[in-house]
Amino acid sequence: MAHNYLLEIGLEEIPAHVVTPSIKQLVQKVTAFLKENRLTYDSIDHFSTPRRLAIRINGLGDQQPDIEEDAKGPARKIAQDADGNWTKAAIGFTRGQGLTVDDITFKTIKGTDYVYVHKLIKGKMTKEILTGLKEVVESINFPTMMKWANFDFKYVRPIRWLVSILDEEVLPFSILDVTAGRRTEGHRFLGEAVELANAEEYEAKLHDQFVIVDADERKQLISNQIKAIAESNRWNVTPNPGLLEEVNNLVEWPTAFNGGFDEKYLAIPEEVLITSMRDHQRFFFVRDQAGKLLPNFISVRNGNEEFIENVVRGNEKVLTARLEDAAFFYEEDQKHDINYYVDRLKKVSFHDKIGSMYEKLQRVNSIAKVIGNTLNLNQTELDDIDRATMIYKFDLVTGMVGEFSELQGVMGEKYAQLNGENQAVAQAIREHYMPNSAEGDLPESVTGAVVALADKFDNIFSFFSAGMIPSGSNDPYALRRHAYGIVRILNSRDWQLDLNQFKSQVKTELAENGTAFGVDVDQNFDQVLNFFNDRIKQLLDHQKISHDIVETVLTGNNHDVTEIIEAAQVLADAKASSTFKDDIEALTRVQRIATKNEESGELNVDPQLFNNASEGELFDQIIKIEAANNLTMSQLFAKLCELTPAISKYFDATMVMDKDENIKRNRLNMMSRLANLILKIGDLTNVLVK
């Protein structure tokens, strides 16, 4: 007979951002529990609101299936004495298995006889096992935990009730002072407690108490209500998915409504209005048919339509107060020019071990010059970058950003435009924060991309120089995100930047300009390179590049981020080639013999010491590749693969490790020069070939 089991954890209000990951975790843990305990079932339904996490397991069997197994015991020489009598070890083993020595058989494993018993394990009843879900409930992890009353137990919020019903039967267990039963709670204000007769009536009974437990159903209802309000007012609304998810996890009985604010506040930059509505008040902003922002909003209350007009007025009042503050700051900020705010950055600490925000601007300006010159940007672009990096953090000390920190960069762009800065400079001030998440949008402008790179490089150089290097999950200054942003920006624009050369150029520029302010870019630079390799690996993993190729390109001698990524794609594409195996084997043969070279200086090769034609033929081709300028990784790999016949011919005719020391050194130097070209692609000995 199939059974249905309901488990509900009743809590005080959970933070909205915790609800969805928590119910997912509960489902995962319950699924693992059922598998571990060999319980068969048809499906698992999940339910979540701000006050409850619940699952219903459908189609459970009566009990675990019986299983048979052979249990291994001690070796025969331990289980029996010299006369063949059973020892205490044998008797104790069989007793522990619920059997007797009469059930013993022997199996030989690697020449040794061992005691075995065959036993039947009867399956436990389902209801007996399900009470073990108590441990599952207690094991859920949350980003923030709390204690309550006098208990040492920690949970996301205090547990106020538990429901545990198998069909119509309560399966009781207790957590702290709460014992599971069939009583659940309705809406905090509109509903009341209700007892469930069985697991199947869960949704209906709570719906009667103004709780929609199905999160997907609740979200769809909210979307429909927003759409209806928008259509009736001829508004355009595109609900932000993140906000919709958050609002959904704030309510149990959603009722959407609309309100408005004075049109005078439309003089404030749109981003400020949207931030006030969306991020601070959880409102959905609206536009007219032409896309213009309107002085209206849509919000969702946790309740019904009763006294909805009071709710509207209350929300309008709160929003108006916030917009009044914004209008004040917007007006006050414009009383000073950009230089005033830049000067104030001298008193703002970037970090107490590194220096002020003003010093950071000077350092970033120097770093940006190196980037701009390396990329051969035109003078207009270089001038824009120079100006942008001298002011790009000024908005941090404005009143608006002090009140609305989410608008840093955005307000910098607005105020820069108002102060007559050109669009490239203004846009770069906003874009230097990009990407602001692992897969966030990248800067659209060249100036913005360079300023973003310089700012992020400075963060990494500064904190690594001060010894504040991320470890494990600890990354308080988001340096991993900054490094990954650098990798993505360089790769997206196909900008070549050798990290070794770049570091040396930055060191020189900082020294010449006197803008290092204690930051030593040489300090922990090996760890900086490893740090970037990890971020390149992250990007290549995201692109589904195989592990062996990732390892190959990261263990070469190339420190150009874009070229490393290109090399990985070149190798991934080349794997399908019919000649790939032969090419890799030829090139790795060169690499392996080159490791025997003890020369560390200039790798001179004297053609006068060649003893056969194959040496000269191969060397001529090596010189041509070395002389080729600006080869892409695709072109370089193609030229290396073209050497396969010459390499094979060379090794057929040449003994590299010649008895004559001069000839041997000459040949090893030639192999090392070719190996160095190969290592620009990567260490091909890591490539798996079939």
Curated annotation (Swiss-Prot):
Its Gene Ontology cellular component terms are: cytosol
Q: Which GO terms describe its biological process?
A: arginyl-tRNA aminoacylation; glycyl-tRNA aminoacylation
Keywords of this protein's UniProt record, alphabetized? Aminoacyl-tRNA synthetase, ATP-binding, Cytoplasm, Ligase, Nucleotide-binding, Protein biosynthesis
Q: What is its EC number?
A: 6.1.1.14
| Primary subcellular site in the record, as a coarse category | cytoplasm
Q: Does Aminoacyl-tRNA synthetase count among this protein's keywords?
A: yes
Places the protein is found? Cytoplasm
GO MF annotation: an example: glycine-tRNA ligase activity
What catalytic reaction does the record list?
tRNA(Gly) + glycine + ATP = glycyl-tRNA(Gly) + AMP + diphosphate
The record's SUPFAM superfamilies line, in alphabetical order, gives: HD-domain/PDEase-like (SSF109604)
Quaternary state and interactors? Tetramer of two alpha and two beta subunits.
Per the similarity annotation, which family is this?
A: Belongs to the class-II aminoacyl-tRNA synthetase family.
Which PANTHER family does the record cross-reference, listed alphabetically?
Answer: GLYCINE--TRNA LIGASE, CHLOROPLASTIC_MITOCHONDRIAL 2, GLYCYL-TRNA SYNTHETASE
Q: Which HAMAP family match?
A: Gly_tRNA_synth_beta
Q: What is this protein called?
A: Glycine--tRNA ligase beta subunit
Source organism per UniProt: Pediococcus pentosaceus (strain ATCC 25745 / CCUG 21536 / LMG 10740 / 183-1w)
Q: What is the lineage of its organism?
A: Bacteria, Bacillati, Bacillota, Bacilli, Lactobacillales
